[in-house]
């Protein structure tokens, strides 16, 4: 649990540019692996000649889904949005494009996830933090912070009435405006222990064909054994797509990223958003910075201009940093640069 400042700090300057780049590079694989809903970039009309614009692809995808099961809802959000501001959910494609064209900057339109796993009938998302380090010319290492949070909406979920932001947007900055904010859980936040309870309850509620399509058929999924490993796989895939964009000169560099996920009613982990400047509570931030510093400063400095080629390749730059057992950043994988 977090202090009362959590609602002011867990929402952050979200940058969906990573989602855009990931969808561009990994679109076919994402659909196949089922971890990223269809995502399209919408450029301002006067900048179409200079910026990728996918509105035709969006309209085609929208038409293909029309009449199929579900409401065919999509969500529009700025690539530089934050705190849930200027987000629109709608099942009307033209209204979404009209909304975007009235706004400034570059936008993305993403298929809205209509069948989320719920807690007491309410929607939630999962925020995780990931430290990416690059201390040599070959690889980026990724570490996952062990304490994630669940952000929960105030009202019961309905796959309709998409203008009701208290139902469909879990951002704390949005939810704190509802009279029931904090009624069900402090600051509308839960932790990974709570997620295990949710997963267990959900498993017990499955029937027939539902359990046939569930990732685990012998037991409930758990955060440690099922959700976090899948999250780490997805994060590593996104880093492969944007490694040159994120760390164009990856020597002696690091970056902290915040990822937002949702879990579907069938147990699938879905990437929703990536944040370049993720926020958190002051208490967690202090612990996080201390743990980050230990990992970042543990690596030896190597001047890339004095060491190159085989010397750099042979140097122990790729080693897993030593850290105290209480460090909450857990080593989660490597990406070739």
Predicted segment positions?
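Asparagine/serine/threonine-enriched low-complexity, disordered tracts
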Residues: 3-16
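Intrinsically disordered, low-complexity serine/threonine-rich segments
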Residues: 7-9, 22-23, 30
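Eukaryotic N-terminal low-complexity, Ser/Thr- and Lys/Arg-rich leader segments
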Residues: 14-19, 28, 329-337
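Hydrophobic/aromatic hotspots within intrinsically disordered, low-complexity regions
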Residues: 18-20, 35-36, 42, 317, ...
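Catalytic core of tubulin tyrosine ligase-like
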Residues: 28-32, 38-256, 264-268, 275-277, ...
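A donor-sugar binding/catalytic signature common to diverse glycosyltransferases
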Residues: 260
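Non-catalytic terminal/accessory segments
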Residues: 313-337
């Amino acid at each position: 649990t977090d202090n009362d400042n959590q609602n002011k700090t867990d929402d952050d300057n979200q940058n969906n540019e990573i989602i855009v780049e990931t969808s561009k590079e990994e679109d076919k694989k994402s659909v196949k692996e089922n971890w990223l809903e269809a995502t399209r970039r919408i450029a301002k009309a006067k900048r179409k000649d200079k910026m990728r614009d996918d509105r035709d692809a969006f309209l085609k995808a929208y038409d293909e889904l029309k009449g199929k099961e579900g409401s065919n809802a999509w969500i529009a959000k700025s690539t530089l949005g934050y705190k849930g501001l200027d987000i629109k959910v709608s099942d009307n494609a033209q209204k979404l494009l009209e909304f975007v064209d009235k706004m400034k900057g570059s936008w993305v339109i993403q298929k809205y996830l209509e069948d989320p796993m719920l807690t007491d009938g309410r929607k939630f998302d999962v925020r995780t933090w990931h430290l990416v380090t690059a201390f040599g010319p070959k690889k980026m290492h990724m570490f996952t912070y062990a304490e994630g949070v669940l952000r929960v909406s105030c009202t019961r979920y309905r796959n309709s009435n998409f203008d009701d932001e208290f139902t469909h947007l879990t951002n704390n900055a949005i939810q704190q405006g509802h009279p029931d904010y904090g009624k069900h859980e402090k600051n509308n936040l839960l932790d990974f222990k709570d997620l295990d309870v949710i997963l267990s309850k959900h498993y017990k509620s499955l029937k027939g064909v539902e359990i046939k399509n569930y990732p685990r058929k012998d037991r409930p999924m758990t955060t440690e054994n099922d959700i976090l490993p899948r999250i780490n796989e997805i994060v590593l895939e996104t880093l492969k797509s944007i490694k040159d964009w994120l760390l164009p000169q990856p020597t002696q560099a690091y970056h902290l990223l915040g990822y937002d996920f949702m879990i579907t009613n069938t147990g699938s982990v879905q990437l929703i958003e990536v944040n370049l400047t993720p926020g958190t509570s002051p208490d967690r931030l202090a612990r996080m910075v201390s743990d980050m510093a230990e990992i970042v400063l543990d690596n030896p400095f190597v001047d890339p201009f004095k060491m190159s080629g085989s010397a750099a390749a042979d140097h122990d730059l790729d080693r897993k940093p030593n850290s105290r057992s209480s460090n909450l950043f857990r080593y989660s994988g490597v990406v070739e640069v």
